A protein has these predicted regions:
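His/Asp/Glu-enriched, well-ordered alpha-helical/loop segment
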Residues: 206-210, 239, 250-327
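Active-site gating loops and adjacent loop-to-helix segments of metal-dependent hydrolytic enzymes
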Residues: 26-57, 67, 91, 95-103, ...
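Histidine-centered catalytic micro-motifs
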Residues: 13-25, 160-170
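Histidine/acidic residue-rich metal-binding segments in metalloenzymes
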Residues: 85-86, 113-236, 248-264, 309
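C-terminal cap of metal-dependent C-N hydrolases
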Residues: 303, 319-360
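Active-site beta-loop-alpha junctions enriched in small/polar residues
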Residues: 21, 79-80, 99-103, 135-139, ...
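Histidine-rich, glycine-flanked metal-binding segment
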Residues: 1-12
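Alpha-helical scaffold segments that flank or form the walls of functional sites
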Residues: 10-11, 28-91, 113-127
Length: 360
């Protein structure tokens, strides 16, 4: 076993990132679209033009960037399986939600078959460190029948679920009014669009998607009734304040979530949105500093993912997931300190060249 000695350093539990898209790490700085629907379309084009080898490299680079920042656990959504393979190969920890798409009700069976095929490749990778889940992507990319089918699959197989939800005004316009740029794009593909006269949250409630532990990503465009529905379902929220700011979507009502008893975690979203994987910056954007930020990024984020009994604090009986920093936890917003050492399940996954094991 390696031994390290640090002077004037602090040891903290490994940080937990509740929302990433690490297979997109190579796309940082490559999408300058301003309007959200166009930005999404450009991401898809860039991703489709990427080779499988480059996606694998991007996923592994993203994991290593997380570890360099002291992040030991990620909750990642993606469609290629590259992040799951990276975690399994490199020895990381995380939940990987396999995305499924299909806005046309007529393609529901095909989308479900593709999801089943992908899960067939991912299930053998599952371990104590890697959980496999599903992610029906978003209300503008998933039909009502597909939402129901994926929710049923997740219940049968006890799979974790993540959904992008109530992120943008355009999403609300699509679901409530059957109008706006998302509606226009769907109709241009020959897909019928009807108004549902409800919010995106209520749309998923009505289709049985929201349940205990379902990770609802963003939840910016919500009202009091939506918050009550999230609480009653036992759902949890992944808040990505810098991404919401970058896309001008507004701010999630954190105080209202907390007052209602809806658990909230912090994530970074993709580097295509925010340029870096910086959980401390996300905490600062959410108004958290010092010990409050540290608790949120460790135990509270672990609790959102249902992993609080195994990680999130330096307690006897939990996994040895930890990070060492050369300076105290930031008391105010500022540059994120790099980790001097990052350990997952007792194994060193990040160590700068200047840090060497102590001679024995």
């Amino acid at each position: 076993m390696e031994s390290f000695e640090f002077v004037a350093a602090v040891i903290v539990p490994g940080l937990v990132n509740v929302h990433t898209h690490l297979e997109l790490t190579h796309l940082v700085g490559r999408n300058d679209e301003v309007e959200f629907p166009k930005w999404l379309r450009r991401v898809r084009e860039l991703k489709d033009a990427t080779t499988p080898d480059d996606l694998s490299s991007a996923a592994e680079r993203g994991l290593r960037e997380c570890w360099a920042a002291g992040v030991t656990t990620v909750a990642d959504t993606g469609s290629t399986g590259a992040v799951a393979l990276g975690i399994a190969r490199l020895g990381g920890r995380g939940i990987v939600y396999q995305e499924v798409f299909g806005p046309d009700p007529a393609s529901c069976d095909q989308s479900l078959a593709e999801l089943g095929h992908a899960l067939g490749h991912l299930r053998p990778l599952a371990s104590e460190r890697l959980r496999i889940g599903v992610s029906p992507h978003a209300p503008y990319t998933v039909s009502a029948p597909l939402y129901r089918a994926v929710a049923d699959l997740a219940r049968r197989e006890r799979l974790p679920v993540a959904v992008h939800l109530a992120e943008s005004p355009e999403e609300t316009e699509l679901i409530r009014d059957g109008a706006g740029p998302f509606a226009d794009a769907l109709r241009a593909r020959g897909i019928a669009v009807e108004p549902h006269h409800c919010s995106p949250v209520q749309f998923l409630v009505q289709r049985g998607v929201l349940a205990s532990g379902v990770l609802c990503i963003h939840c910016v465009q919500v009202d009091d009734a939506d918050i009550r529905s999230l609480r009653e379902a036992g759902a949890v929220v992944a808040h990505c304040p810098l991404s919401n700011r970058a896309h001008r979507h507004g701010t999630a009502p954190l105080a209202a979530f907390r007052a209602a008893g809806v658990p909230v975690g912090l994530g970074t979203d993709s580097v295509v949105s925010v340029g870096s994987i910086d959980l401390w910056a996300e905490a600062a954007a959410a108004g958290l500093t010092g010990g409050d930020a540290l608790r949120q990024l460790t135990l509270d984020n672990a609790r959102v993912l249902g992993w609080e009994t195994e990680i999130g604090s330096l307690d006897v009986g939990k996994w040895a997931d930890l990070a060492v920093f050369a300076q105290p936890v930031p008391a105010r917003p500022g540059p994120t300190p790099p980790a001097l050492l990052t350990v997952i399940a007792g194994r060193v996954v990040h160590r700068p060249e200047a840090v060497s094991p102590r001679a024995r």
